[in-house]
C-alpha cells in the first residue's frame, strides 16, 4: 500500500480491527457511460476509484447508485464495453474483499434496463452481486439496507408502507432527489423525497442523481 492510501485510511480510521458492527461502504453513481470518451473515463475510474477501494483493508459493500449508463447503447459499442469492464473490476474487488456489490437502477432514460447485462453475476456462487430494479430491503452483513431505484407510477401508499411500515433499517441507498437539492424541486415523473421520509433510517441516506456533491440535513448525501 502506498503512503497516500495509508494516510487516507488513517484519516478515516479504516483499520482491520474496526468495530465489526460497522458497515464499511464505497459508493459511486451517475457515471453515464459514454457521455465522455469511455476509454478515458475508464482509466480515470481505475486511477481515482477502483485502485483506491481495492487497496482498502476492509470493505463490506460497494454500491453503484444509478445511471451507470447515459442512454441506451448497442452491446457492441465502446460505451457498453468499458461500462462492463468497470463492473467486472467491481466484481473482482467485491470477491477479493468478501464484500457485496449492489447495482441500483437509475433514471429510465439513462440506464434503460441495461443492468440486465449483469444479471449473470447473480448466478455466481463465489461472489455476492445484486442488481436492484425495484424497491426492497437487502441484508448485508447483518445490516438492513433500503434500496430505492428511480421508479415511476408507484402508488404513494406503497412508498408509505416501505418507508414507515417496515420497521427500522441501517442504511438507505437510492437514485432520486431530496427536497432542496435542485432548484424548484423539479423531479419530473419521479418522486420527491423529504428528510422526514427516512425517520426509520438509523444511518445515512446515500443517493445518486444530482450531479453535485452535497450534504442535506446532516444525513442525506
For the regions a language model picked out, list residue spans one by one.
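Extended active-site neighborhood of metal-dependent phosphoesterases/phosphodiesterases
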Residues: 5-17, 85-153
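Metal-dependent catalytic neighborhoods of phosphoester/phosphodiester hydrolases
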Residues: 36-40, 66-91, 105-125, 214-220
Amino acid at each position: 500500500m502506498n503512503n497516500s492510501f495509508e494516510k487516507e485510511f488513517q484519516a478515516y480510521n479504516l483499520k482491520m480491527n474496526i468495530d465489526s458492527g460497522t458497515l464499511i461502504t464505497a459508493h459511486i453513481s451517475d457515471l453515464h457511460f459514454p457521455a465522455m470518451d469511455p476509454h478515458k473515463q475508464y482509466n480515470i475510474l481505475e486511477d481515482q476509484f477502483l485502485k483506491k477501494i481495492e487497496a482498502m483493508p476492509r470493505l463490506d459493500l460497494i454500491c453503484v447508485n444509478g445511471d451507470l449508463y447515459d442512454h441506451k447503447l448497442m452491446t457492441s459499442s465502446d460505451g457498453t464495453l468499458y461500462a462492463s469492464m468497470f463492473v467486472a473490476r467491481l466484481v473482482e474487488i467485491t470477491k477479493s474483499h468478501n464484500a457485496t456489490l449492489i447495482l441500483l437502477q437509475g433514471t429510465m432514460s439513462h440506464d434503460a434496463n441495461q443492468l440486465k447485462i449483469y444479471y449473470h453475476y447473480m448466478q455466481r456462487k463465489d461472489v455476492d452481486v445484486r442488481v436492484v430494479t425495484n424497491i426492497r430491503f437487502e441484508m448485508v452483513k447483518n445490516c438492513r439496507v433500503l434500496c430505492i431505484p428511480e421508479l415511476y407510477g408507484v402508488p404513494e401508499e406503497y412508498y408509505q408502507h416501505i418507508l414507515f411500515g417496515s420497521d427500522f433499517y441501517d442504511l438507505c441507498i437510492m437514485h432520486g432527489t431530496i427536497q432542496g437539492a435542485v432548484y424548484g424541486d423539479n423531479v419530473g415523473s419521479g418522486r420527491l423525497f423529504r428528510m422526514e421520509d427516512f425517520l426509520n433510517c438509523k444511518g445515512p441516506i446515500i443517493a445518486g442523481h444530482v450531479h453535485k456533491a452535497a450534504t442535506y440535513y446532516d444525513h442525506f448525501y
